[in-house]
Regions:
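Non-heme di-metal
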Residues: 1-139
Length: 139
């Protein structure tokens, strides 16, 4: 039975997103705990974040069958992974962050708009780095 288009595929995508977000939140919480002097708590957050990464990787391994959850492009081999990464970063710098910056500015959140515009520039740089890496692969 095909995974593509199934509820299981959507569940894997949702679980991947949740585990990925948990990883980043826990690393952020660990940094905060470090600043506050709670090194033992920071270590708990970091080790748990590592576990969440393993869970996310497991979901992504199953999703190789259906494509990148962010772009829908094929993933697995490095060349495909780079193409999916380029597409994702390109979307972020051409559509996502500019749109978010406009909304933030329209709502009077100029500092956040500036942040989003800065991130768009960073994402363009990421896309360019991935493109260079793709161009350097032996085909």
């Amino acid at each position: 039975m095909s995974l593509k288009g199934s509820q299981t595929e959507q569940n894997l995508k949702d679980a991947f997103a949740g585990e990925s977000q948990a990883n980043r939140r826990y690393l952020y919480f660990a940094a905060k705990a470090d600043v506050e002097g709670y090194n033992d708590v920071a270590a708990v957050f970091r080790s748990t974040a590592e576990g969440e990464t393993g869970h996310a990787h497991g979901h992504l391994e199953y999703l190789e069958e259906t494509g990148d959850p962010a772009t829908g492009l094929p993933i697995g081999p490095t060349s495909d992974n780079l193409k999916a990464a380029i597409a994702g970063e390109t979307h972020e710098y051409t559509d996502m962050y500019p749109g978010m910056a406009k909304t933030a500015r329209d709502e009077g959140h100029d500092e956040i708009a500036d942040w989003m515009e800065t991130l768009a520039k960073a994402e363009r740089s990421h896309a360019n780095r991935f493109q260079k890496a793709l161009d350097s692969l032996d085909d």
